[in-house]
Amino acid sequence: MYSASDLRKNLRIKLEGDPYIITEFNFVKPGKGQALYRCKLKNMITGNQFERTFRSVDNFEAADLQEKKMQFLYTEEDRYCFMDNTSYEQIFLTADQVGDAAHFLIDNLEVEILLFEDKPLGISLPNFVDLVVTKADPWAKGDTVSGNTKPVTLQTGYQIMVPPFIEEGEKIRVDTRTGEYLTRVKG
């Protein structure tokens, strides 16, 4: 159980039976009266956002969310299949639930599936993923002098900007939080 003074950004609470995450948080102390907490909340099931003001005497239940390690198996139309490595149970998530994480999903990648009352809500990727460059324009020596970048296509179909010396067939490390190139991966 949380009190209003426990509220902070990224806290997950249960409100009216649904899980919410606090995306913005402001403490307001008026000249007279009790303190107020102005929050922007995002429904973790529907994705809807709204603002709400809470009084300092309000209490909240913690959202009963579990994270489960699972392995990405395959894509079937607009559904993504994941498997629990211990029970071999398979679950499907929609393209909306996976979101932008789809750009970095490769076979057998271990991810965290966020569950609310045993229903999947979304996924958390590892911070870094190694992906193969499937399409890259050739480069000429001297192109690196100006510090330019060039677009490449990765094995998932995602396009990112990389240094000009990256070639087709090479494996690179990508930051899944920003979608940016980090380094070349040897071997």
Swiss-Prot record:
UniProt keyword list: Cytoplasm, Elongation factor, Protein biosynthesis
An example Gene Ontology molecular-function term: translation elongation factor activity
Protein name per Swiss-Prot or TrEMBL: Elongation factor P
InterPro entries tied to this protein: Elong-fact-P_C, NA-bd_OB-fold, Rib_uL2_dom2, Transl_elong_fac_P/YeiP, Transl_elong_KOW-like, Transl_elong_P/YeiP_cen, Transl_elong_P/YeiP_CS, Transl_elongation_fac_P
Species of origin: Syntrophus aciditrophicus (strain SB)
KW Cytoplasm (keyword) present: yes
Function: Involved in peptide bond synthesis. Stimulates efficient translation and peptide-bond synthesis on native or reconstituted 70S ribosomes in vitro. Probably functions indirectly by altering the affinity of the ribosome for aminoacyl-tRNA, thus increasing their reactivity as acceptors for peptidyl transferase.
SUPFAM superfamilies in UniProt: Nucleic acid-binding proteins (SSF50249), Translation proteins SH3-like domain (SSF50104)
GO BP terms, alphabetized: peptide biosynthetic process
PROSITE patterns assigned: EFP
Subcellular location: Cytoplasm
NCBIfam families found in the cross-reference section: efp, PRK00529.1
Similarity comment: family membership: Belongs to the elongation factor P family.
Keyword Transit peptide applies: no
Chief localization: cytoplasm
GO terms under cellular component: cytoplasm
Pathway note: Protein biosynthesis; polypeptide chain elongation
